[in-house]
């Protein structure tokens, strides 16, 4: 299997058999790792597997690591790297933010695959306990075995913390691959401008021995990786067009979920590909008198060979602005269809930025919005849109609390035999990860439909009226 990102082959018989099962069982449905790019989670998983092998090869020369970690535990890390995304499905993170009833998080879905249909392959080809793989992926302590002494179980707890830090942490195998891969696939240079080989070559154990650190050799490479992640967030992941598409898609699914049983919606999302989901959602939003409309668990289709052309773009004429919806359900379908056609239709029509601000620009309003769950932002959006006379045509996007440019890793100075936090020895990292990221990348944005955006931008007291909508929401929430 040739990997275009690293320009080399990834070959191993156990890896090959496991990935065949993995790809056939789950990841064939999840095409895009980043929605605007053209690559798959399957490719990404092979890349993470490759980086994990490189780090293990490096750490094999570390005396403390060699004395601590057993061969089967190293195999557990390799398998966890290969299967770390097995629970994902198309648009997974966007849907999880909606908190739909019955939707289990991708971590739980991964455990069901690992302990279910993948378990025989894992045991036969890897001689690894699937529960240990789940523990590493979930950053949990391993299950205590009947033969474990107190000392042995204590050692295993340390090992599993170490393995989890290699897979998911400030500098880990997942980020190392997705920054490069997303950058290549999206056609931008930002995620490629750091020295992966030098960074991997500097990896060592931290002072406690339960996580990774880097030596001074990798300090500059680590700084450049932090910078790469900062710029990728600024110019790709949280670019205003990306965020507009995100909130439009979430709102469309939210509207549909009010009329379609969520258990069927979730089941169909798990088995459909990206393109099939687009066609499926468009069919769900056809007018009520359309014979292909499906609004119940019994007639919700599995569109194995669906195309966007099958979804009836011409039916949008039934939802023109002059036609009053016959029911609240009609209105929801109309609004959802507008959003979906803006995303997946013949001509892209994303909602436009009307306002955006950081915590520096709006120190009072910003913290009242940042970190709010989706359903609260939806309620605020609806109130604000109604107050401006544009119901259904305004969406609020605010940064979540769990996204940061992580940098909490130590740098080892062998000449002095001391460890120092990267943020302490690198003002560049501190400025990027705290000041620049928090102050400039993490912005609150208000998007509006293209036909009303220009008018809304001219409202002189826009932010004050926005604040009043938040006031009203908070007052009602306290009642």
Language-model segments: which ranges?
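Aromatic-lined, polymer-binding surfaces characteristic
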Residues: 83
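Histidine-centered, transition-metal-coordinating active-site segments
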Residues: 1-78, 86-479
